[in-house]
Amino acid sequence: VPNGVMLQHFVGWEVRAAADTFDPTKAILMDFRCDQTRGMHFIYCLPFSDQEALIESTLFSPELAPNDFYDAAITGYLKSICQLSEFEISRRESGVIPLGVLGQHDPKLAGIGANGGAIRPSSGYAFSFIHKQIDYAVSHAVNGRPLAVGVPHSGFELWMDRIFLAVLRRHPELAPD
């Protein structure tokens, strides 16, 4: 990943708490009621049941934060927003997604996924775009054509993503608005 590329980095906890703690019919996406000093930062709360949920601290910035930043954000969210002081962490996850168009590792090989430009720079989403790349490659193979993998984003979409990420980099305080 080139230096200075915006990154989406996150830590998530699957937590278990007392009955009726979470509403399993209500997911909370991109809750900005958290520390914004390091970049665009938000919390996800994805309940699996009334006792279990994935709480994830996600940050968009060019530099990773220390692990205790994410842990403090999740703990603070559970205490202040969920009104929860007692919980058990059943699983932890973390990851980093580069938000930009990455060059292929080997131009002689068709790249799929991040290496093939599947990550949407503005969001970090890739799953459905990887699926499109695979469908494209399979259709070429089935029809006897050389293996090819298309970039699933238009030039216009990538241009708009570059503008969005430039604004996030220069003015992260505007993100919650």
Feature locations, PLM:
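Predominantly flavin-linked oxidoreductase catalytic cores and closely associated redox partners
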Residues: V1-E88, I97-H105
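Aromatic-anchored, charged helix-turn/loop surface patch used as a conserved interaction hotspot
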Residues: L7, P121-Y125
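FAD-binding beta-loop-beta segment adjacent to the flavin cofactor pocket
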Residues: D35-M40, S94-I112, P121, F164-A175
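AAA+ P-loop NTPase domains with strong preference for DNA replication initiators
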Residues: K108, F127, H131, V149-S154
